[in-house]
Amino acid sequence: TVKTEPTRFDDGETRVAVILPFLLDRFAPEEQGRMVEFYQGFLMAAERLKNEKHSFEINTFDSGFKEKSLDSLINSGALDNMDIIIGAYYPNHNKQLGRFALEKRIPLVIPFSNRKDELYNNPMVFFVNTLQSSIMNDVTGNFVKRFPDANVIFVEDTIKSNKESFIKSM
């Protein structure tokens, strides 16, 4: 038999930190609604796992708006004993949490971002959304295979568009 080291999940209860911008200090219904909807889905998933005999301690934190730093939360020690951290939303918050997760060896799940940045090489960071750059070749290859003789016209909104590399690859 192979002797294994105990993992952070061996004590029977998983300590989860959820860090999202609920924006409790301002009125932003669209952004707040998106976070509340995600959180409700998270709680439904946790409830289902509880029904399968998994035990959770869920700690929820409001990260605030993007200009707010997470230093006070990180320095408070509230995250030190978490088994997993879910969040945040804004890139600057993700960077702060990524450094913390690496230092403390706590897995960080980023549910919203799909941007390739310095967190991409952090072994403690897990992205839920697939990076667009990692699927671009498959999408364009399949399109060209399926529609080899198609005359395609792309209409691009040059103000909001970030699809230039996709369009050029087609």
Features from the language model and the residues they span:
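Short, well-structured alpha-helical segments in soluble
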Residues: 67-83
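Structural motif
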Residues: 15, 83-84
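Short hydrophobic segments within beta-strands
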Residues: 19-21, 61, 153-156
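Sec-exported extracytoplasmic/periplasmic mature domains
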Residues: 21, 43, 47-51, 75-79, ...
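Pro/Ala/Gly-rich low-complexity, hydrophilic intrinsically disordered segments
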Residues: 1-20, 27
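Glycine- and acidic-residue-enriched helix-capping/strand-helix junction motifs
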Residues: 27-40, 161-165
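Extracytoplasmic ligand/sensor domains, especially the bilobed periplasmic-binding protein
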Residues: 86-87, 93-155, 160-166
